[in-house]
């Protein structure tokens, strides 16, 4: 007996579902494959004088070029609270300011997405603006991002630091590293000089070299007389008389032979 046509469709439906889920999983994997991390850079803290404009600098780095999908959001966490309020959004060249009273009509766009800049300006900053500011950037497919945090302090003009804290820290660090390098180089030079003095085994000519008394040059007749004056009873092998050059010139290694050499046989009695 043949099975109804509808039964075959019901039997095949689980296989079709498994196939559909496999296709969806593969598509999701392709979509998430191109997702990469986006890096945001902000100063850790800044000081702004009361009643003046403050610039919140935010830079980012992305492997993809910016476009219409790139967006920037700024949030604020008031000092002493855990509540975060979004007060500014920028996308497709448009500014979307929130209705949060402390920032109403105060915030303006100061960045350039083509230059990876997401900075903003806040006019007439007051003490109520003390807190932490959060910069969040999305640049699909770079959507995995660690937002940047800025700790902002509004202070009186009289106590405003001459330089930002991060600048002072950088200068101090550079000075310390420079001094350390200089001291290390000086110590290395001193150490090498001391070792070279210890390894040197030379002597002072004026102190350790005693003068050598040169022997007067003998004439041939004097040499013959010396031979004749020896006792006649002894026996000795050939005797060679030579004269050395003690002049100390450039060619001191050359041996200068005497003008005459006398051989004598002396026999013992």
Curated annotation (Swiss-Prot):
Residues 36-146 form the Ig-like V-type domain. Phosphorylated on tyrosine residues upon stimulation with pervanadate and concanavalin-A (ConA). Phosphorylation at Tyr-241 and Tyr-263 is required for interaction with PTPN11/SHP-2. Dephosphorylated by PTPN11/SHP-2 (in vitro). Its main location: membrane. The modification Phosphotyrosine is found at residues 241, 263. InterPro entries: Ig-like_dom, Ig-like_dom_sf, Ig-like_fold, Ig_sub, Ig_V-set, Myelin_P0-rel. Disulfide bonds join 58-135. Glycans are attached at residues 50, 64, 130. Residues 1-35 form the signal peptide. Residues 203-213 have a biased composition (Polar residues). A motif (ITIM motif 1) lies at residues 239-244. Keywords: Disulfide bond, Glycoprotein, Immunoglobulin domain, Membrane, Phosphoprotein, Signal, Transmembrane, Transmembrane helix. GO terms for cellular component: plasma membrane. It comes from the Eukaryota. Interacts with phosphorylated PTPN11/SHP-2. Belongs to the myelin P0 protein family. Cell surface receptor, which is involved in signal transduction processes. Recruits PTPN11/SHP-2 to the cell membrane and is a putative substrate of PTPN11/SHP-2. Is a major receptor for concanavalin-A (ConA) and is involved in cellular signaling induced by ConA, which probably includes Src family tyrosine-protein kinases. May be involved in regulation of integrin-mediated cell motility. This is Myelin protein zero-like protein 1. It comes from Bos taurus (Bovine).
